[in-house]
């Protein structure tokens, strides 16, 4: 009987409803999401390139920011392309294995980003509270180890939840009232009692949220105490410029995750869940590079330096109707 249930599950087919309730908005939404995703890709890959080519940004803080841009690019690229396709085609079906693969990679990168924000908070804490020991405390070896650990933890959490999803059983054809394969949506469709799977999802999400927020809040509590002891206003401004971008990104990302996964589903309508999911799967990956570029002096200086090089500056080239020559 177990084999029969496993075969039924593996052969199950799902239809992603997405935004089919709003047929008149399908095309406008397609172009809006395409633009947002396009700018997100350019912003995150651009941030990676800027950090790579500018030696001044080869510090632990920008090493972690580099990985944040990579993670944002990855998890938005797992969701956005399929969402865009489903906005313009009638066949929105996906197999159970396809659903599971999408969820696994998406969950891996989302959990990785949660831990990464906590690591970045600790990095800010050491830089501000122990500046003389910063290069010793946050060494290249430690940075590499932390990155390996946070990716490994993301994979471990995803693997645990994916294995729990393998135990779910479905009847043939199913409809997911979402635009991607979210585990809570799959659990709600399974026909035996799926309480344990729901409990596991809630436990993993809550544990990651509480542990990372505890690290973040503790780090910033020490940062605030240290800042209040600084006699000069310039020191306060420097701390603010260092932490403002990170705090803004944390507030947006963690607020959305808490709303979606650490509140009982019954308290949120499916429409509200979809809107919040769009925000953290498509919009947040666009906002992060903007936040870190517009509110970060070092990044703005790096961008300005690139623009002002002889290859980009208008004063260093003469334009002709069919060609241009760059002055040496």
Curated annotation (Swiss-Prot):
An example molecular function term from Gene Ontology annotations: G protein-coupled receptor activity
One biological process term in Gene Ontology: G protein-coupled receptor signaling pathway
Cystine pairs: none
Extent of the signal sequence: none
Keyword Membrane annotated: yes
Pfam families in the cross-refs: 7tm_4 (PF13853)
Protein name, per record: Olfactory receptor 5D16
Segments in the Extracellular topological domain: 1-27, 78-101, 163-198, 261-273
Function per UniProt: Odorant receptor.
Superkingdom classification of source: Eukaryota
Organism: Homo sapiens
Membrane topology type: Multi-pass membrane protein
All ranges on the Cytoplasmic side of the membrane: 49-56, 123-141, 220-239, 295-328
Keywords: Cell membrane, G-protein coupled receptor, Glycoprotein, Membrane, Olfaction, Receptor, Sensory transduction, Transducer, Transmembrane, Transmembrane helix
UniProt entry tagged with the keyword Lipid biosynthesis: no
InterPro entries: GPCR_Rhodpsn, GPCR_Rhodpsn_7TM, Olfact_rcpt
Subcellular location, record wording: Cell membrane
Positions annotated with a glycan in the UniProt record: 7
Family listed: Belongs to the G-protein coupled receptor 1 family.
Residues that span the membrane, as ranges: 28-48, 57-77, 102-122, 142-162, 199-219, 240-260, 274-294
Gene Ontology CC annotations of this record: plasma membrane
GN (gene name): OR5D16
């Amino acid at each position: 009987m177990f084999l029969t249930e496993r075969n039924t599950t593996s052969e199950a087919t799902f239809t992603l409803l997405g935004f089919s309730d709003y047929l008149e908005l399908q095309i406008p939404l397609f172009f809006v999401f395409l633009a947002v995703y396009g700018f997100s890709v350019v912003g995150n890959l651009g941030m990676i390139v800027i950090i790579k080519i500018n030696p001044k940004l080869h510090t632990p803080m920008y090493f972690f920011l580099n990985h944040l841009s990579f993670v944002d690019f990855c998890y938005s690229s797992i969701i956005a392309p399929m969402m865009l396709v489903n906005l313009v085609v009638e066949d929105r079906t996906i197999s159970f294995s396809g659903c599971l693969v999408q969820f696994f990679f998406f969950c891996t990168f989302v959990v990785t980003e949660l831990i990464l924000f906590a690591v970045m908070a600790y990095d800010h804490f050491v830089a501000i509270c122990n500046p003389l020991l910063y290069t010793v405390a946050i060494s290249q070896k430690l940075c590499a180890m932390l990155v390996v650990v946070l990716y490994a933890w993301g994979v471990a959490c995803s693997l645990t939840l994916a294995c729990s999803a393998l135990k779910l059983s479905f009847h043939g054809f199913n409809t997911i009232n979402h635009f991607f394969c979210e585990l809570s949506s799959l659990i709600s469709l399974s026909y035996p009692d799926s309480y344990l799977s729901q409990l596991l999802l809630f436990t993993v999400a809550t544990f990651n949220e509480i542990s990372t927020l505890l690290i973040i809040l503790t780090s910033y509590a020490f940062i605030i105490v240290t800042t209040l002891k600084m006699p000069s206003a310039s020191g306060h401004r420097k701390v603010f410029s260092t932490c403002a971008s990170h705090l803004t990104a944390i507030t947006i990302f963690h607020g959305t995750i808490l709303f979606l996964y650490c509140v009982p589903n019954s308290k949120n309508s499916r429409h509200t869940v979809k809107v919040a999911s769009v925000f953290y799967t498509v919009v947040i990956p666009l906002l992060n590079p903007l936040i870190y570029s517009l509110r970060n002096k070092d990044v703005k200086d790096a961008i300005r330096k690139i623009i002002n090089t002889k290859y980009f500056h208008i004063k260093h080239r003469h334009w002709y109707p069919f060609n241009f020559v760059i002055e040496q």
